[in-house]
Regions:
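N-terminal subdomain of nucleotide-sugar transferases
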Residues: 1-39, 151-156
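Active-site proximal beta-strand in glycosyltransferases
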Residues: 3, 53-55, 70-88, 118
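Short N-terminal targeting/anchoring amphipathic segment
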Residues: 45-64, 77-79
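Membrane-proximal helix-turn-helix segments that form the acceptor-binding/catalytic region
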Residues: 100-116
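The feature captures the alpha-helical scaffold/lid subdomain characteristic of nucleotidyltransferase
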Residues: 107, 166-252
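A short, active-site helix/loop in glycosyltransferases that binds the activated sugar's phosphate group
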Residues: 112-136
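C-terminal alpha-helical cap of glycosyltransferases
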Residues: 140, 144-145, 149-174
Length: 252
């Protein structure tokens, strides 16, 4: 998994900066992780790195909203952590008039457009739900504030959240190989004849070249389209090396 984290700046002794540094350091054990700040070239990193997930950690900034929109246009999954900046106190006591304008111009739109929000407590989740902008909100506690939670556990829970988001929008991630594989799987799965030459060699090679992530997306698609039994029949007939994945247990 390839992840880009965006934050306005990294500051020594800053609570949010400490959180992000601990999160990204732990995540690097399980994923390819990059961090970019306001001073970095976000668009270039997005094009060069081609992330699966863009995680925005900055609220009330037009540049952050622009980056979220740009990443979405590039078919990246975008998640947003407001870090308590959307609770009532932050909205109504700090730069109240300015934030009202920003809400109308871009902040509410950003929240509605991202794939999901990630917050650190149920109270923060409830505060955001009251706004009515989105219901797609998950919780992973902050190891900086919760000493009983290790950085590693926080990283793993966050990556599980990313996986949930990716599984929800799997069709955006489907490659040409997967899209070409679907008709082949259906052809063999539905075929009445039992000959060994049910597919041309190039189509058979395509099926045998699929990796576990590609099979995962194919299985999710097959479940959603009601063709899983046909796909499984093809896998059995051709003795394809497909992973065993219980898609019914996948949270989306």
């Amino acid at each position: 998994m390839r992840i880009i984290h965006y934050i306005d700046s990294i500051k020594a002794g800053n609570l949010l900066s400490d959180y992000l540094l601990r999160l990204t350091t732990a995540q690097k054990e399980y994923a390819d992780v990059k961090t970019v700040t306001q001073q970095g070239d976000f668009k270039k990193l997005l094009a060069d790195f081609q992330p699966d997930i863009v995680h925005i950690h900055t609220c009330w900034e037009y540049q952050a909203a622009t980056h979220a929109n740009w990443a979405a246009k590039k078919q990246c999954a975008v998640v947003f952590s407001p870090h308590w900046e959307l609770d009532e106190r932050a909205r109504t006591t700090e730069q109240k008039s300015t934030k009202k304008v920003k809400t109308l111009l871009y902040q509410a739109k950003m929240v509605r457009r991202v794939d999901a929000l990630l917050v650190s407590s149920e109270q923060e989740r409830q505060d955001i739900l009251k706004l009515g902008w989105t219901k797609r909100i998950d919780i992973v506690q902050d190891s900086v504030l919760n000493s009983s939670l290790s950085d590693d556990d926080m990283a793993l829970q966050t990556i599980s959240f990313y996986r949930k988001v990716l599984d929800t929008r799997y069709q955006f991630a489907m490659t040409a190989m997967e899209k070409e594989a679907i008709p082949s799987l259906l052809h063999v799965g539905l075929a009445q004849e039992t000959t060994h030459n049910l597919l041309p060699s190039d189509q058979l090679l395509n099926l045998r070249s699929l990796n576990p992530e590609q099979w995962r997306r194919i299985f999710l698609y097959a479940d959603d389209e009601g063709i899983r039994e046909i796909v499984d029949n093809c896998i059995s007939r051709l003795q394809l090396n497909a992973p065993t994945i219980d898609t019914a247990a996948i949270q989306r």
